[in-house]
Amino acid sequence: MGNWAVNEGLSIFVILVWLGLNVFLFVWYYRVYDIPPKFFYTRKLLGSALALARAPAACLNFNCMLILLPVCRNLLSFLRGSSACCSTRVRRQLDRNLTFHKMVAWMIALHSAIHTIAHLFNVEWCVNARVNNSDPYSVALSELGDRQNESYLNFARKRIKNPEGGLYLAVTLLAGITGVVITLCLILIITSSTKTIRRSYFEVFWYTHHLFVIFFIGLAIHGAERIVRGQTAESLAVHNITVCEQKISEWGKIKECPIPQFAGNPPMTWKWIVGPMFLYLCERLVRFWRSQQKVVITKVVTHPFKTIELQMKKKGFKMEVGQYIFVKCPKVSKLEWHPFTLTSAPEEDFFSIHIRIVGDWTEGLFNACGCDKQEFQDAWKLPKIAVDGPFGTASEDVFSYEVVMLVGAGIGVTPFASILKSVWYKYCNNATNLKLKKIYFYWLCRDTHAFEWFADLLQLLESQMQERNNAGFLSYNIYLTGWDESQANHFAVHHDEEKDVITGLKQKTLYGRPNWDNEFKTIASQHPNTRIGVFLCGPEALAETLSKQSISNSESGPRGVHFIFNKENF
């Protein structure tokens, strides 16, 4: 239990608090509409669907308040960089912002479904009561408001039978119109956010996500007509429901039972969402201001395996290891921003990203930079680039540990390029205050060509550590996870050579996948009583494996070895 608490305790606590608040709001508002006399006659008309519609509405307000906060990148980056505000454990929660964003989105979808279904029943009962297709009590309540000095309870004012009556309400009432619009927006946003769409059709994901603007506008005005009505306090004072509920035919005729008066509650949703919407507006203004700052591409390097490197400069740009930026190329798309990890080190006088060509946008950037041509491309012909960032990630905390495990899969190695470069520069400058004493680096890749662009950096580090008699500082293991029979024969022939046939490094390439249980146990035995940072940039399946290994190989109690798992999310 102690092992689990070290890695996941705070995360689970945050989730439980969030779930608890959802349960509290649901139960509280269910009782508000299901018990008090204010809504007695409304319950007579609508039944239990009244409370079942209003309770999830309160939860929707709460979650719609939260949904924008995890995507305020500049706010999170500010909090992350404030040591007075955020400890390492709190920063790890900020690094899971997108996970929380998705959880809140699914909660919004759940409560939207309950809210919508309950209101469909409400509409049916209101329309039926209006056309005398219901019990006499509901019909009598529905006739309130037809005469002068009366306020209505039933929001269906026209005598139109179902299903036409329900459709009429959907297209004439503000609540109906906005309800249809925001539900359609929500469906499009969620369905376009699947992993398949994001990876293969990012443009679809990007554009449909901006329907959130329409969603929030519709949400803010959804309740403006106040069609869910309850008895007013003044009416309750003179109209005692205990006495009058069975004397509906005598309402307005006897002194003790005047005709009840009804009114809707003032809209509340805007009060929940105005703060986050203001913060997000500030976020977008900061992004726009940054996008207008001049960025100069100083070099474009074409690497094997359809990977390009962009080296850039921007006035006032400051970065830390492992951070990422958003990039827009107006020549390719005037609206799309794409995230890329910085592969340069803070000590360098430029910042760089490595981009693998896998989609329409990256293909367009590849062509815009002239990488599809054989001849040299003049600098003035390179496209204009807009950059937003940098933004913090889990990898920023790598220098907070004495021992770290860095695990990259495929192009997921890019955050660690920045870290390893920075380590190299620190050793070149004889850094004496470096807390980090040992790096275990693992790189898993399917194709041999993918190793080529990264091998030079590893060779520099390898030689640097040997020159300074600190060869044990960096232990790296490169795994080739895909090969054919001819490659295997070639590797076997050259196995006894001094340097690896693929990378040119002294450390030989390994084939297959690591035995993570053995790796963790070996590292734990070599570093007792140590907090070891485990940093991954790779697929979810590998993240699940490493997270479980971090928990199972950590010792309970404050002392002993503890593996702290961190994963890149952007």
From Swiss-Prot:
Q: Which residues are glycosylated?
A: N132, N149, N240
Residues that coordinate or bind FAD? R199, S200, W337, H338, P339, T341, H354, R356, W361, T362
Q: What is its EC number?
A: 1.6.3.-
Residues binding heme b 1 are H101, W206, H209, Y280, R287
UniProt binding sites for NADPH: I411, R446, T481, R513
Give the top-level enzyme category: oxidoreductase
Q: Where is the Ferric oxidoreductase domain?
A: 54-286
Topology feature Extracellular, residues: 37-46, 131-163, 223-267
Provide the FAD-binding FR-type domain boundaries. Answer: 287-397
Q: Which GO terms describe its molecular function?
A: FAD binding; flavin adenine dinucleotide binding; heme binding; metal ion binding; NADPH binding; protein heterodimerization activity; superoxide-generating NAD(P)H oxidase activity; superoxide-generating NADPH oxidase activity
The observed outcome of changing G223L is: In CGDX; requires 2 nucleotide substitutions and
* CC terms in the record's Gene Ontology section: dendrite; endoplasmic reticulum membrane; monoatomic ion channel complex; NADPH oxidase complex; neuronal cell body; nuclear envelope; perinuclear endoplasmic reticulum; phagocytic vesicle membrane
Task: Tell me which UniProt keywords the record has, alphabetically.
Answer: Cell membrane, Chronic granulomatous disease, Disease variant, Electron transport, FAD, Flavoprotein, Glycoprotein, Heme, Ion channel, Ion transport, Iron, Isopeptide bond, Membrane, Metal-binding, NADP, Oxidoreductase, Phosphoprotein, Transmembrane, Transmembrane helix, Transport, Ubl conjugation, Voltage-gated channel
Q: How does it sit in the membrane?
A: Multi-pass membrane protein
Query: What are the transmembrane regions?
Result: 10-36, 47-72, 96-130, 164-194, 204-222, 268-285
A biological-process GO annotation? inflammatory response
Q: Where in the cell is it found?
A: Cell membrane
Relate the assembly described in the record.
Component of the phagocyte NADPH oxidase core complex/cytochrome b558 complex, composed of CYBB (heavy chain (beta)) and CYBA (light chain (alpha)). Component of the phagocyte NADPH oxidase complex composed of an obligatory core heterodimer formed by the membrane proteins CYBA and CYBB and the cytosolic regulatory subunits NCF1/p47-phox, NCF2/p67-phox, NCF4/p40-phox and the small GTPase RAC1 or RAC2. Interacts with NCF1 (phosphorylated form). Interacts with NCF2; the interaction is enhanced in the presence of GBP7. Interacts with RAC2. Interacts with RAC1.
What this protein is reported to do is described as: Catalytic subunit of the phagocyte NADPH oxidase complex that mediates the transfer of electrons from cytosolic NADPH to O2 to produce the superoxide anion (O2(-)). In the activated complex, electrons are first transferred from NADPH to flavin adenine dinucleotide (FAD) and subsequently transferred via two heme molecules to molecular oxygen, producing superoxide through an outer-sphere reaction.
What is the name of this protein? NADPH oxidase 2
Organism name:
Homo sapiens (Human)
